[in-house]
Protein backbone atom coordinates (compact mmCIF):
# COMPACT_ATOMS: atom_id res chain seq x y z
CA UNK A 1 0.00 0.00 0.00
CA UNK A 2 2.81 2.37 0.94
CA UNK A 3 4.67 1.47 -2.26
CA UNK A 4 1.61 2.27 -4.39
CA UNK A 5 1.30 5.67 -2.75
CA UNK A 6 4.97 6.48 -3.27
CA UNK A 7 4.76 5.40 -6.91
CA UNK A 8 1.66 7.54 -7.45
CA UNK A 9 3.36 10.57 -5.95
CA UNK A 10 6.49 10.00 -8.03
CA UNK A 11 4.53 9.62 -11.27
CA UNK A 12 3.65 13.31 -11.50
CA UNK A 13 0.18 12.39 -12.76
CA UNK A 14 -1.70 14.01 -9.92
CA UNK A 15 -1.97 17.67 -8.89
CA UNK A 16 -1.63 16.68 -5.24
CA UNK A 17 0.43 14.44 -2.98
CA UNK A 18 -1.09 11.42 -1.30
CA UNK A 19 -0.10 10.89 2.32
CA UNK A 20 -0.52 7.60 4.17
CA UNK A 21 -1.65 7.71 7.79
CA UNK A 22 -1.01 4.35 9.46
CA UNK A 23 -2.87 3.40 12.65
CA UNK A 24 -2.65 0.06 14.47
CA UNK A 25 -5.96 -1.71 15.15
CA UNK A 26 -4.17 -4.34 17.31
CA UNK A 27 -6.58 -6.96 15.89
CA UNK A 28 -9.04 -5.65 18.47
CA UNK A 29 -12.49 -4.30 17.51
CA UNK A 30 -12.51 -1.56 20.16
CA UNK A 31 -9.05 -0.37 19.13
CA UNK A 32 -10.09 -0.50 15.49
CA UNK A 33 -13.20 1.57 16.16
CA UNK A 34 -11.13 4.18 18.00
CA UNK A 35 -8.72 4.36 15.06
CA UNK A 36 -11.58 4.64 12.55
CA UNK A 37 -13.20 7.46 14.52
CA UNK A 38 -9.88 9.29 14.60
CA UNK A 39 -9.56 9.00 10.83
CA UNK A 40 -13.08 10.08 9.92
CA UNK A 41 -12.78 13.11 12.20
CA UNK A 42 -9.90 14.41 10.07
CA UNK A 43 -11.24 16.33 7.03
CA UNK A 44 -8.00 15.61 5.15
CA UNK A 45 -8.75 11.87 5.09
CA UNK A 46 -10.45 10.97 1.80
CA UNK A 47 -10.28 7.15 1.86
CA UNK A 48 -9.19 4.28 4.07
CA UNK A 49 -8.04 0.67 3.83
CA UNK A 50 -7.84 -2.16 6.41
CA UNK A 51 -8.00 -4.75 8.16
CA UNK A 52 -6.46 -8.18 8.63
CA UNK A 53 -8.89 -9.17 11.38
CA UNK A 54 -12.52 -9.81 10.41
CA UNK A 55 -14.16 -8.83 13.73
CA UNK A 56 -12.33 -5.51 13.51
CA UNK A 57 -13.54 -4.91 9.96
CA UNK A 58 -17.10 -5.79 10.95
CA UNK A 59 -16.87 -3.17 13.69
CA UNK A 60 -15.40 -0.33 11.61
CA UNK A 61 -17.25 -0.56 8.29
CA UNK A 62 -20.32 1.09 9.81
CA UNK A 63 -18.22 4.10 10.79
CA UNK A 64 -16.70 4.55 7.35
CA UNK A 65 -20.13 4.09 5.78
CA UNK A 66 -21.74 6.65 8.10
CA UNK A 67 -19.07 9.24 7.38
CA UNK A 68 -19.04 8.42 3.65
CA UNK A 69 -15.34 7.53 3.59
CA UNK A 70 -14.57 4.93 0.88
CA UNK A 71 -13.09 1.85 2.51
CA UNK A 72 -11.20 -1.05 0.90
CA UNK A 73 -10.73 -4.27 2.85
CA UNK A 74 -7.40 -5.86 1.99
CA UNK A 75 -7.22 -8.83 4.36
CA UNK A 76 -10.35 -9.59 6.40
CA UNK A 77 -12.30 -12.45 4.82
CA UNK A 78 -15.62 -12.66 6.67
CA UNK A 79 -18.30 -12.67 3.93
CA UNK A 80 -20.66 -10.33 5.80
CA UNK A 81 -18.23 -7.44 5.41
CA UNK A 82 -19.48 -6.92 1.88
CA UNK A 83 -22.07 -9.67 1.41
CA UNK A 84 -24.52 -8.83 4.19
CA UNK A 85 -24.24 -5.08 4.71
CA UNK A 86 -23.62 -4.20 1.06
CA UNK A 87 -22.41 -0.68 1.82
CA UNK A 88 -21.65 0.91 -1.56
CA UNK A 89 -18.47 2.55 -0.26
CA UNK A 90 -17.06 -0.65 1.27
CA UNK A 91 -15.26 -2.97 -1.13
CA UNK A 92 -12.77 -5.80 -0.84
CA UNK A 93 -9.73 -7.10 -2.70
CA UNK A 94 -9.45 -10.20 -0.48
CA UNK A 95 -11.54 -13.33 -1.04
CA UNK A 96 -14.15 -14.41 1.48
CA UNK A 97 -13.64 -17.31 3.84
CA UNK A 98 -16.28 -19.22 1.89
CA UNK A 99 -14.12 -18.90 -1.22
CA UNK A 100 -11.13 -20.14 0.76
CA UNK A 101 -12.86 -23.05 2.49
CA UNK A 102 -14.18 -24.47 -0.79
CA UNK A 103 -10.82 -25.37 -2.38
CA UNK A 104 -9.47 -26.47 1.01
CA UNK A 105 -12.38 -28.87 1.41
CA UNK A 106 -11.89 -30.17 -2.14
CA UNK A 107 -8.21 -30.81 -1.42
CA UNK A 108 -8.48 -32.58 1.91
CA UNK A 109 -11.42 -34.77 0.85
CA UNK A 110 -11.01 -35.08 -2.91
CA UNK A 111 -7.23 -35.31 -3.16
CA UNK A 112 -6.12 -36.64 0.24
CA UNK A 113 -9.17 -38.87 0.61
CA UNK A 114 -9.83 -37.95 4.24
CA UNK A 115 -13.40 -38.50 5.42
CA UNK A 116 -13.47 -38.12 9.20
CA UNK A 117 -12.80 -34.76 10.84
CA UNK A 118 -12.75 -33.03 14.18
CA UNK A 119 -13.41 -29.29 14.14
CA UNK A 120 -12.08 -26.71 16.57
CA UNK A 121 -13.14 -23.10 16.04
CA UNK A 122 -12.90 -19.93 18.07
CA UNK A 123 -16.02 -18.11 19.20
CA UNK A 124 -15.36 -14.90 17.27
CA UNK A 125 -17.55 -14.03 14.29
CA UNK A 126 -14.66 -15.21 12.10
CA UNK A 127 -14.39 -18.58 13.82
CA UNK A 128 -18.13 -19.17 13.86
CA UNK A 129 -18.43 -18.39 10.17
CA UNK A 130 -15.59 -20.79 9.35
CA UNK A 131 -17.47 -23.51 11.19
CA UNK A 132 -20.66 -22.65 9.29
CA UNK A 133 -18.75 -22.73 6.01
CA UNK A 134 -16.59 -25.83 6.37
CA UNK A 135 -18.96 -28.24 8.09
CA UNK A 136 -21.72 -28.32 5.45
CA UNK A 137 -19.14 -28.33 2.66
CA UNK A 138 -17.44 -31.38 4.16
CA UNK A 139 -20.68 -33.19 4.94
CA UNK A 140 -21.92 -32.44 1.44
CA UNK A 141 -18.93 -34.37 0.11
CA UNK A 142 -19.71 -37.37 2.29
CA UNK A 143 -17.37 -36.58 5.17
CA UNK A 144 -18.24 -37.25 8.80
CA UNK A 145 -17.72 -34.67 11.54
CA UNK A 146 -16.70 -36.57 14.67
CA UNK A 147 -16.59 -33.61 17.04
CA UNK A 148 -16.99 -29.84 17.18
CA UNK A 149 -15.37 -27.76 19.91
CA UNK A 150 -15.55 -23.98 20.32
CA UNK A 151 -12.84 -22.08 22.18
CA UNK A 152 -12.51 -18.47 23.23
CA UNK A 153 -9.81 -16.29 21.71
CA UNK A 154 -6.92 -16.22 24.15
CA UNK A 155 -7.22 -19.86 25.24
CA UNK A 156 -3.77 -21.39 25.75
CA UNK A 157 -4.40 -24.95 26.96
CA UNK A 158 -6.11 -27.16 24.39
CA UNK A 159 -4.89 -30.49 25.75
CA UNK A 160 -8.23 -31.62 27.26
CA UNK A 161 -9.96 -31.08 23.90
CA UNK A 162 -7.12 -32.66 21.94
CA UNK A 163 -7.00 -35.69 24.24
CA UNK A 164 -10.70 -36.24 23.59
CA UNK A 165 -10.18 -35.78 19.85
CA UNK A 166 -7.30 -38.27 19.90
CA UNK A 167 -9.70 -40.90 21.22
CA UNK A 168 -12.03 -40.28 18.26
CA UNK A 169 -9.19 -40.95 15.80
CA UNK A 170 -10.13 -38.45 13.06
CA UNK A 171 -8.26 -38.32 9.78
CA UNK A 172 -7.55 -34.63 10.35
CA UNK A 173 -8.29 -31.63 12.56
CA UNK A 174 -9.80 -28.51 11.00
CA UNK A 175 -9.29 -25.21 12.78
CA UNK A 176 -11.46 -22.13 12.32
CA UNK A 177 -9.44 -19.37 13.89
CA UNK A 178 -6.25 -17.38 13.67
CA UNK A 179 -2.54 -17.52 14.33
CA UNK A 180 -1.80 -17.93 18.03
CA UNK A 181 -4.56 -20.36 18.96
CA UNK A 182 -3.89 -22.34 15.79
CA UNK A 183 -0.18 -22.57 16.54
CA UNK A 184 -0.80 -23.69 20.11
CA UNK A 185 -3.25 -26.35 18.95
CA UNK A 186 -0.77 -27.68 16.40
CA UNK A 187 2.01 -27.75 18.99
CA UNK A 188 -0.15 -29.44 21.61
CA UNK A 189 -1.40 -32.03 19.12
CA UNK A 190 2.16 -33.36 19.04
CA UNK A 191 2.44 -33.27 22.81
CA UNK A 192 -0.69 -35.39 23.36
CA UNK A 193 0.25 -37.80 20.58
CA UNK A 194 -2.41 -36.66 18.12
CA UNK A 195 -0.34 -37.17 14.99
CA UNK A 196 -2.91 -36.11 12.44
CA UNK A 197 -3.13 -33.44 9.76
CA UNK A 198 -3.94 -29.98 11.09
CA UNK A 199 -5.42 -27.65 8.48
CA UNK A 200 -7.05 -24.25 8.23
CA UNK A 201 -7.49 -21.34 5.84
CA UNK A 202 -5.40 -18.17 5.65
CA UNK A 203 -6.11 -16.98 9.19
CA UNK A 204 -3.08 -18.95 10.40
CA UNK A 205 -0.70 -17.83 7.64
CA UNK A 206 1.96 -15.95 9.55
CA UNK A 207 5.58 -16.48 10.55
CA UNK A 208 4.43 -16.50 14.17
CA UNK A 209 2.52 -19.72 13.50
CA UNK A 210 5.70 -21.54 12.47
CA UNK A 211 7.62 -20.01 15.35
CA UNK A 212 5.15 -21.30 17.95
CA UNK A 213 3.97 -24.53 16.30
CA UNK A 214 7.36 -25.64 15.06
CA UNK A 215 8.10 -27.58 11.88
PLM regions with names:
Residues 1-20, 139-143:
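Signal peptide-proximal N-terminal region
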Residues 20-22, 147-150:
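A structural preference for short, hydrophobic beta-strand core positions in alpha/beta folds
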Residues 22, 29-46, 106-107, 156-169:
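Short, well-structured alpha-helical segments in soluble
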Residues 145-149, 161-164, 168, 181-196, ...:
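Internal alpha/beta domain cores that form substrate/cofactor-binding pockets in large enzymes
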Amino acid sequence: FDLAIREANASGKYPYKVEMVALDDASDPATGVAAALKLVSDPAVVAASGHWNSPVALATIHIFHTYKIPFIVWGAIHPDITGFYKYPGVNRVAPTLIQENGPLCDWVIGELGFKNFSIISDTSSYGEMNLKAFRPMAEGKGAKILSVDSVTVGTTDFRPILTKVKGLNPDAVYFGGVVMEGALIRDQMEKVGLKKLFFAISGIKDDKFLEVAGP
